[in-house]
């Protein structure tokens, strides 16, 4: 009898070990699949051999570039040292992508490793927290994941310790959360740690919810998107956010991570796109009242990426025709969903015809009208004070902002003095009265100036 019990126990132990091994193999399979998909997405980029040749020639033996300042701590949006990582990204893509002369180049590999090693040792500082938490890690993670399997695991783990999982920081919300979560996902892939990948994916999925309180950052019930207090940011942060969500929906499709994006979350995201972003743009242009300080950037008016809509055609097949029509509209076809909508959480009204766009933006005590941060949008004070956006071609405001009279923004009533448009920090509304009504076809918007 004792012998039978011993045999039974040994059998149970063997079964447990076998099951554990299968779970481990499945986990590694998922890690490899996710890693492969991420790498494949980076290798879609084109390689400019002349650019790579320039970087390879310039890189010094210690892994630094002679034209970059790694020492000076800059404030705001200036971070010259960050170009180091962007160059390494391009070099790593060239190394991994077949069909160019740098593919599998041993010399280029050594240079990329030297560049990563230099950054790991020196760790250039910035006066802007964003570069430390998000900007630099986002660029650093790409060459590192592209070198997985090309350098020793020991080296890979050593360099990946630079990447930190910051998803536990509750201060990272909306777009900032998807940024830090992407770093965690890459770290998990690099280190063969499926738990980190789960944490990152779950963190991204957690942003797909309605945030009801005014001041909470993220998706609003009216289809608008807020970032930086109760501020309309469907463009800028919001456009980058929807790019991220559509990308990760595609990335996890058919994997163990797909269930984190429940149907409820997908429905919320689809409403954000169809009932929000689609209505705030016209052809290739996004409403300048919904892009915050991005109005000061060269590509600030860019509308949603066609690639994002292509991802959604595959992940929301019931509305594939709607995404296709939207994509055609970006290239000049008639707008597919004409009408009027008032975004009551964001104090903006839009009116669409098949061949025109009109919007008016106001402010109230419930909203933060716009912002000046990092020396961007220095003259944006009047932007939420009745500004009217009128588009028929979609190119009316292309390149105009550097020479605009910011005291005469269409639709506004402003003091005609050079300093009256100057903005410092956030612009908070002081008027309680402000809002609009809409029946879906026509609407009225007003506010107390």
Question: Model regions: which residues?
Answer:
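Intrinsic-disorder-associated interaction segments
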Residues: 23-32, 44-48, 80, 105-108, ...
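Aromatic-lined, polymer-binding surfaces characteristic
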Residues: 53-287, 292
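Extended polysaccharide-engagement surfaces of secreted carbohydrate-active enzymes
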Residues: 248-449
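Bacterial Sec-dependent N-terminal signal peptides
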Residues: 1-23
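Alpha-helix initiation and N-capping motif
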Residues: 52, 156, 319-323
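Mature N-terminal, pre-catalytic/accessory segment of carbohydrate-active enzymes
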Residues: 20-80
């Amino acid at each position: 009898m004792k012998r039978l019990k011993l045999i039974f126990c040994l059998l149970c132990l063997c079964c447990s070990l076998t099951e554990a091994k299968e779970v481990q193999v499945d986990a590694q399979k998922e890690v490899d699949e996710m890693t492969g998909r991420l790498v494949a997405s980076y290798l879609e980029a084109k390689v400019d051999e002349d650019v790579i040749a320039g970087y390879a020639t310039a890189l010094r033996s210690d892994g630094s570039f002679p034209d970059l300042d790694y020492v000076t701590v800059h404030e705001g949006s200036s971070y010259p040292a960050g170009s180091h990582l962007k160059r390494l990204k391009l070099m790593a893509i060239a190394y991994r992508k077949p069909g160019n002369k740098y593919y599998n180049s041993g010399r280029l590999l050594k240079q990329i490793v030297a560049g990563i090693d230099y950054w790991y040792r020196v760790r250039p500082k910035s006066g802007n927290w964003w570069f430390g938490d998000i900007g630099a890690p986002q660029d650093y993670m790409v060459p590192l994941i592209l070198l997985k399997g090309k350098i020793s695991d020991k080296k890979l783990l050593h360099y990946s310790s630079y990447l930190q999982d910051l998803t536990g920081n509750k201060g990272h919300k909306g777009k900032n959360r998807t940024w830090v979560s992407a770093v965690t996902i890459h770290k998990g892939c690099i280190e063969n740690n499926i738990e980190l990948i789960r944490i990152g994916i779950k963190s991204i999925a957690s942003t797909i919810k309605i945030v009801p309180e005014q001041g909470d950052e993220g998706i609003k019930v009216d289809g608008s998107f807020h970032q930086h207090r109760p501020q309309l940011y469907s463009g800028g942060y919001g456009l980058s956010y929807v790019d991220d969500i559509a990308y990760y929906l595609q990335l996890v499709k058919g994997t163990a991570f797909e269930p984190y994006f429940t149907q409820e979350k997908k429905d919320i995201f689809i409403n954000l796109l169809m009932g929000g972003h689609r209505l705030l743009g016209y052809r290739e242009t996004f409403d300048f009242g919904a892009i915050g300080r991005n109005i000061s950037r060269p590509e600030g008016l860019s509308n949603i990426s066609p690639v994002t809509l292509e991802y959604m055609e595959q992940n929301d097949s019931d509305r594939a025709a709607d995404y296709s029509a939207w994509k055609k509209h970006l290239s000049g076809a008639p707008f597919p969903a004409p009408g009027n909508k008032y975004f009551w959480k964001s104090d903006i009204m839009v009116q669409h015809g098949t061949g025109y766009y009109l919007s008016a933006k106001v402010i109230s005590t419930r909203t933060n009208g716009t912002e000046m941060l990092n020396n961007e949008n220095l003259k944006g004070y009047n932007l939420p004070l009745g500004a009217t956006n009128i588009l028929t071609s979609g190119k009316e405001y292309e390149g105009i902002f550097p020479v605009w009279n910011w005291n005469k923004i269409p639709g506004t009533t402003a003091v005609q003095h050079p300093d009256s448009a100057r903005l410092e920090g956030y612009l908070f509304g002081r008027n309680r009265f402000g809002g609009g009504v809409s029946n879906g076809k026509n609407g009225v918007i007003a506010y107390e100036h």
